[in-house]
C-alpha cells in the first residue's frame, strides 16, 4: 500500500479517495482525545511516516522543490512528509492544550531506529537502520509535560525505549513489584537529576542484509550487521561479533562517527566492557549461535566481494 487512500492495507479501513495517511492518523488521535478527555487515557500513535514508500502530498513536495538542502538531506518528497508529520503532531498537542490537559499529560516523541542510508544520510553518525553503529540506534527523544518538565531543558543521559514502561508505571503509581523490568525509571531526569552508572545493551544474534553493498557503511559489504552484541557504558561503546570474535571499541563522546577503533590501544577498557557484556548475556540467557550453517557458500561470498572491490576501484578511477 501507500500513503493515499485506498491504502491497500488489510489492517486499515480506507478513507475518502486521496486521503493522506498521516492526516488520517492525526484525525483519529484528535477524535480519541476529544472522546476520552474526562477519563484517564493512553494513546500509542505510531505514525507510518516517515517510512517507505516516500510519498508526500503534492503541495508540500512542491514547497521544497526549489529549496536548497545540504549534502546529506536534499529530498523534497522526504521534507514534505516530515512537514505533514510535524503538522499533525502539532494538532495533537494543540488539542491537549485546548482541553486544559497539558498539566496532566506526558507526551513522548521518539523513533524505533535510525534512518535508511539510501533515503537520508545520518552523517556524522555511521551507517543506518539495522546497524549497531550510532546511525542505526541513536534516535530523537522528546518528553513534554507542562509543569513537570522544564521547558526547553536538555539531558545528555543515554536512555532506551525500554525505559518508557517503568517511567509510566511510576507516574501512574503502579506498585506491582512482581513485574520484571528491563528498563529504568526516567523520572529523576525530568527533575534535572542523573541516572549515570547504567549501561545499555543491544543483542542481535542473526544477520541483516545490506540495502546497498557500496554505501551502507556497515561491518562488511553484504550485511548491515552480522550476529553480535553491543554494550554502551558511560562514553564507551564496544561491539562484539560472533562469527570471528571481532571486537571494536569506540569513545563515542569524542568520536561519534565510530571511526577510530581503540580496542587494541586500550586493552583495559576493552576487557572491562567485554566482561560486563558477557555477564549480561549470561544473566539473561542471551542466545548465541554456535553451529555453522551447512549451506554457507564461501566461493559465492568471495565472488561477490571481488565484484564489489572491482566496482569500487572502477569508480575511483572514473572520479
Residue ranges of model-derived segments:
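Histidine-centered active-site microenvironments of extracellular/periplasmic hydrolases
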Residues: 53-59, 94-148, 160, 309, ...
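A long, amphipathic alpha-helix that forms part
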Residues: 20, 24-34, 62-104
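Active-site His/acidic residue clusters
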Residues: 29-77, 116, 122-123
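Long, internal low-complexity/basic segments
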Residues: 164, 201, 207, 243-246, ...
Amino acid at each position: 500500500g501507500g500513503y493515499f487512500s485506498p491504502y491497500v492495507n488489510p489492517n486499515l479501513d480506507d478513507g475518502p479517495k486521496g486521503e493522506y495517511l498521516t492526516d488520517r492518523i492525526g484525525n483519529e488521535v484528535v477524535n480519541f482525545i476529544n472522546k476520552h478527555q474526562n477519563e484517564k487515557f493512553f494513546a500509542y500513535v505510531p505514525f507510518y511516516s516517515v517510512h517507505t514508500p516516500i510519498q508526500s502530498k503534492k503541495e508540500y513536495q512542491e514547497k521544497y522543490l526549489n529549496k536548497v538542502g545540504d549534502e546529506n538531506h536534499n529530498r523534497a518528497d522526504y521534507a514534505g512528509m516530515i512537514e505533514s508529520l510535524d503538522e499533525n503532531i502539532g494538532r495533537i498537542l494543540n488539542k491537549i492544550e485546548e482541553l486544559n490537559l497539558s498539566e496532566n499529560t506526558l507526551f513522548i516523541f521518539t523513533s524505533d531506529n535510525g534512518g535508511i542510508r539510501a533515503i537520508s544520510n545520518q552523517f556524522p553518525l555511521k551507517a543506518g537502520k539495522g546497524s549497531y553503529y550510532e546511525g542505526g540506534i541513536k534516535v530523537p527523544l522528546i518528553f513534554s509535560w507542562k509543569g513537570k518538565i522544564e521547558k526547553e531543558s536538555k539531558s545528555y543521559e543515554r536512555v532506551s525505549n525500554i525505559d518508557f514502561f517503568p517511567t509510566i508505571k511510576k507516574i501512574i503509581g503502579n506498585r506491582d513489584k512482581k513485574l520484571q523490568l528491563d528498563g529504568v525509571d526516567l523520572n529523576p531526569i525530568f527533575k534535572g537529576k542523573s541516572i549515570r552508572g547504567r549501561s545499555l545493551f543491544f543483542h542481535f544474534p542473526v544477520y541483516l542484509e545490506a540495502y546497498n553493498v557500496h554505501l551502507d557503511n556497515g561491518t562488511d559489504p553484504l550485511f548491515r550487521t552480522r550476529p553480535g552484541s553491543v554494550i554502551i557504558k558511560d562514553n564507551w561503546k564496544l561491539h562484539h561479533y560472533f562469527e570471528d570474535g571481532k571486537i571494536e571499541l569506540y569513545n563515542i563522546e569524542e568520536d561519534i562517527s565510530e571511526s577510530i577503533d581503540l580496542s587494541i590501544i586500550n586493552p583495559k577498557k576493552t576487557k572491562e566492557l567485554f566482561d560486563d557484556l558477557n555477564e549480561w548475556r549470561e544473566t539473561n540467557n542471551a542466545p548465541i549461535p554456535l553451529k555453522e550453517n551447512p549451506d554457507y557458500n564461501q566461493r559465492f561470498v568471495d565472488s561477490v566481494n571481488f565484484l564489489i572491490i572491482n566496482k569500487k576501484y572502477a569508480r575511483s578511477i572514473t572520479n
